[in-house]
Amino acid sequence: MKALSKLKAEEGIWMTDVPVPELGHNDLLIKIRKTAICGTDVHIYNWDEWSQKTIPVPMVVGHEYVGEVVGIGQEVKGFKIGDRVSGEGHITCGHCRNCRGGRTHLCRNTIGVGVNRPGCFAEYLVIPAFNAFKIPDNISDDLASIFDPFGNAVHTALSFDLVGEDVLVSGAGPIGIMAAAVAKHVGARNVVITDVNEYRLELARKMGITRAVNVAKENLNDVMAELGMTEGFDVGLEMSGAPPAFRTMLDTMNHGGRIAMLGIPPSDMSIDWTKVIFKGLFIKGIYGREMFETWYKMAALIQSGLDLSPIITHRFSIDDFQKGFDAMRSGQSGKVILSWD
């Protein structure tokens, strides 16, 4: 079968021919329809320090997808041939304390599809049936293919009660924009998103965010005054991993504010901890998606009218995968979809 693989320990990704993966007793064989390129895939393409320490070579990569069930392991129940599915990219052990306690998203032995085991940038993918999620008929293939990053956004945004709250989102990448859209959809009062990338801030405006602020050109305190905010933000969603953005968030949070952090800083990050202490801030780290509560919430949000379509900006045939990676690496894109049909 055709597959995109990390063949060499250097920059790039390559189209290869690999065997169709073997179906285990508890697995599903999925024929891939569409995949989306994640920031993680760009890290792997660039072969940065994280990738060099993490990714085995050679390996099929990718973890954002939608496809059709074409094979079912003999122990699997609840699925049938032809079911349209996406899937949770974190394969958990089932045996650690968190798994046995129902907190599978916190499994200490998590293995990543397309990171530690063969991924979805291929004509076929095998995953445990436990990890598959059936896609409702009224959700398109395009949207289903980005459920993985949408899940990061939903998990982060819905960490706290947002109704009537003022929310600051730092980082207008696709996940940050989707998190801001979720916050607005579920009843936040003001949702402000910050970045320095004007292309992505314009995407946020198309998604109906209250204010998309280029912090290289505008002062966040001026924006808060314009919105009639006198006490600071109630909820912060840190999606950028940029130390200056997190420090600004700490500066502008209200006392008793709550922060969910998904963005990964590039290295050690120094902050003024007295602001955390004296403001009584609550900071929560976010990893992946809650299994599978986040997935049900994703489907319900879309079915209740949340429109994510502006975030998908580029579509290519898999034969033009290089154009897709070029678009992602340029910073001038939202989500990029690769079609395998």
UniProtKB/Swiss-Prot annotation:
It is found in: Cytoplasm. Its EC number is 1.1.1.103. GO terms for molecular function: L-threonine 3-dehydrogenase activity; zinc ion binding. GO terms for biological process: L-threonine catabolic process to glycine. It catalyses: L-threonine + NAD(+) = (2S)-2-amino-3-oxobutanoate + NADH + H(+). Zn(2+) 2 binds at residues 93, 96, 99, 107. Its cofactor is Zn(2+). The record marks 148 as: Important for catalytic activity for the proton relay mechanism but does not participate directly in the coordination of zinc atom. Keywords: Cytoplasm, Metal-binding, NAD, Oxidoreductase, Zinc. Its main location: cytoplasm. Zn(2+) 1 binds at residues 38, 63-64. One of its GO terms (cellular component) is cytoplasm. Binds 2 Zn(2+) ions per subunit. PROSITE patterns: ADH_ZINC. The active site is at residues 40, 43. SMART domains: PKS_ER (SM00829). NAD(+) binds at residues 175, 195, 200, 262-264, 286-287. Pfam families: ADH_N (PF08240), ADH_zinc_N (PF00107). InterPro entries: ADH-like_C (IPR013149), ADH-like_N (IPR013154), ADH_Zn_CS (IPR002328), GroES-like_sf (IPR011032), L-Threonine_3-DHase (IPR004627), NAD(P)-bd_dom_sf (IPR036291), PKS_ER (IPR020843), Zn_alcohol_dh (IPR050129). Pathway: Amino-acid degradation; L-threonine degradation via oxydo-reductase pathway; glycine from L-threonine: step 1/2. Homotetramer. PANTHER family: L-THREONINE 3-DEHYDROGENASE. Catalyzes the NAD(+)-dependent oxidation of L-threonine to 2-amino-3-ketobutyrate. Belongs to the zinc-containing alcohol dehydrogenase family. This is L-threonine 3-dehydrogenase. It comes from Shigella boydii serotype 18 (strain CDC 3083-94 / BS512).
